[in-house]
Amino acid sequence: MAPSVATSLKAEILPSPRTSSPSSNFKTCVSNENGCINCRCSPSEPHESANVDESVNKLSKTFSKLSLNPTFQALNMDLGLLHENITLDRIPKVPENHVSLIDIDEARAKEDPNFQIHSTPSRMPPHYVQPHPPFSVFPAPILDVRELTKPGAVKRVFHFELDVSNYPLPEGEEWMVGGSFGVMAPNNEEDVDELLQLLHINPDQADAPVLLKTDGGRWPTIWAEDTPRELVTTRRELLKWTVEFMSVAPKKQLIRLLAEYAKDDTERQVLLFLVSRLGQRAFCDLRDHNVTLITLLKAFPSVQLPLDHLLTVLPQLMPRWYSLSNDPKVSNNVLEFAVTVVEINKVEGGTRSGIGSGFLKRLALRFLNGERDLVLPMYRGLHKNAFATHFASDGPMCLIGAGVGVAPFRGFVQRRLTNATCAGKVWVFHGCRDQELDELYHGEWENPLQKSSDDDASSTVSQQTETEMDSFEVKKDGTSGPNHLVVESRSHQHAYVQDEIRHRGDIVWSVLSHPHGKVYLCGGKKGFLDGVENALIDVCVQYGKMSRLEATQQLALWQSPLNLKYIKEIW
């Protein structure tokens, strides 16, 4: 980690012995910016020249005051290069403002038939949010929610069931096994309230109608026509449904905008340093620590940021995608899916949930606490993801998933169980941390249409691997259902899915070498993808009698559009 701010400032802000005058001025100038090679955080943009005059004594005092701010301290920025003789160059120009907000009265607002003043938080996005035009976002009633993990699991996973009997499917389209759908998850109400407060917008202003004007682009519609637009909305509605301010690392455009509206000279100088060439390392480190706009506004409290200018630089709030965990043909007009709640460490301490998973967690808890009449804002999309378009109705298959990545394979198994001759040709490699706490859909793989209960008897037999506590389970009789192998890691010598792929290499190779065999992979990219693909290469080397280079090339060939024997969905 970088040295603490207090240490860096004390050492670097005091006048240098080589400086003849204690009132030397900071200098800032700009030129073309190359950006950061490591994180690619700074695209080439127009730059400007600027001079910032600040006496060293005044700067020292104000830095001391700034360092008392606990949020500023939590950023732990390395400001060692920021001293009285600094020359700041390659500072981006202030982003142009392409948005305006004009207050209007309610009578004028009612002229827009789509505008509604909500006395309670709206459950659905405004009409102009169109992720799949010309179709609107659909309020799918939530039929059921259950928690798939048990207390003590590292991550919580919830299962949802949605009623889509009234969904306006276009003629000739259907819900497909392996398909995915979009959820229009809003920003958390508490985060929106906090941001409004930091922007000095009171509740009456937040909910008052405004006329939004844009110079062009698709925002705030997502995918509507790229054109200038005027529409009636509210400030709260825009922050809740149309912009990302919690889940995207800050870009230099945003930092530069904060600097422009900082009333305190020292705060402005720190912000300019972060977007300068010399501050590149500090900027990249800042982006790596889950810093949000709210954190920055707390760390630099003198910033008086206008909402219209802020909306120009914030990215569009995009839909979150979830894979179906059931076969829609078997479960008529019901869509099922699972979601892992993502918890993110906050730089100032504590955790926060992800945008999509946090929204779904809040809905799940409300349902489990007895609340009904809940809906999920969702839409079908194109159903063009790899699993939906390349599901195989026959032939042997290996389904490899870790954590919630195994959920779409439940739908695969449901479909294959409708054909008794195909059921035993399916092998599910199911990775989890602890089978007792976080094995998903426990007891449902032999009959996925029947929900499990805590006292369900397992039809699997546990066998020990080379490590004392790591075990897998494999169904004894694979003729009447899928062969379900659970790989769990509970000891210091972890066993992962890739270990079981090697252990069962003969089975995996029998699928890969079959003319109609397919291997499906689903899970997180970090660690999991490389581990599984290395294991598949090892299987090809051992059982296919290939060199490692040949096996690597063969795996790539199996992923080509003309072959598609190996199909993956990775996030």
Curated annotation (Swiss-Prot):
Cofactor(s) needed, names only, are: FAD
Cell cycle found in the keyword field? no
Coiled-coil residue spans: none
Stretches the record annotates as Disordered: 1-25, 447-479
Q: Which cystines does this chain contain?
A: none
Entry keyword annotation includes Flavoprotein: yes
A GO biological process this protein is involved in?
Answer: homocysteine metabolic process
**Protein known as:** Uncharacterized FAD-binding protein C12C2.03c
